[in-house]
């Protein structure tokens, strides 16, 4: 398999990723600002499918209407010239000091109203750009001090904000879905909707939850000590995996935003295995963009930035090649059968069987030989060894 990406691979990048200047809480920028038009042309040259952005990645917070129109005109022309798409747009409700206590959940009602209006205006822009997904990351929605929030009221306000945005999308007839992005902490000490599980539970409380799903990120789930592949699997199973952010993370620490696969490589392999091959017994498959949300090393100049963009795509394609070979290997298929992976796809109850029927089945309870069943060798290590051998290219 070629590791030369093409638009058919549907790789996308946030403007804030390749455009990150290297500024962090401990140091100033190490690179100059990147012209969004240059970003479009360079990503297209590298074989990407699309580019995404927060409103203020592209248009400064305090831009005049004339400045806004000029920026959008230049950006749209670059998109037209290159064929690059904008599959997703999101809103910055975290950088400006007005959002220091959040947007949708700020204790200041006037700020909440401003934040919601900002989102609604940005939904219009997303629709104009042809985006299909509108991501909401509540980076400042949370607290450091438990007594500072009425937590029930905060969740009410979050629901109000998301439902208002979703209702607006429906009223306008836009071909957009909302994807909530969970994260446990950073920049807030504790962020509302910190994990995939929290996000799924929240969506169930929405009036317009039918067009609201999730945008899980590799590092965000791993920051909470969770298994990213399990998280996206549950979102996919619930048919709520609307978008995905791929990057690298090494353990429970700050959000590293490494190149995809440059953190937990085994986890990255099984993530790609799920995205490309789907569930072993069938089920929903992810068909959206493979979106990279990472930070190029601040130690590098722009040559290094573009090398890092290429590295994300190359890592994915290499892992895709390994994952396809893994599933196609007859020895792996036999090992999966031995381990009971396919048996798990069989319903526990027989067709038409009730709980009462099961209780009356003596072979399943009184006559069940638990000691003999306990002797079964599931051979999970052998199956995993085959996966690692494929990952390392030794098979």
From Swiss-Prot:
Mg(2+) 2 binds at residues 217, 220, 255, 257. SUPFAM superfamilies: Xylose isomerase-like. This is Xylose isomerase. Mg(2+) 1 binds at residues 181, 217, 245, 293. It is an enzyme of class 5 (isomerase). It is found in: Cytoplasm. Keywords: Carbohydrate metabolism, Cytoplasm, Isomerase, Magnesium, Metal-binding, Xylose metabolism. Binds 2 magnesium ions per subunit. One of its GO terms (cellular component) is cytoplasm. Its EC number is 5.3.1.5. The active site is at residues 54, 57. It comes from Arthrobacter sp. (strain NRRL B3728). PANTHER family: PTHR48408, XYLOSE ISOMERASE. GO terms for molecular function: magnesium ion binding; xylose isomerase activity. It catalyses: alpha-D-xylose = alpha-D-xylulofuranose.
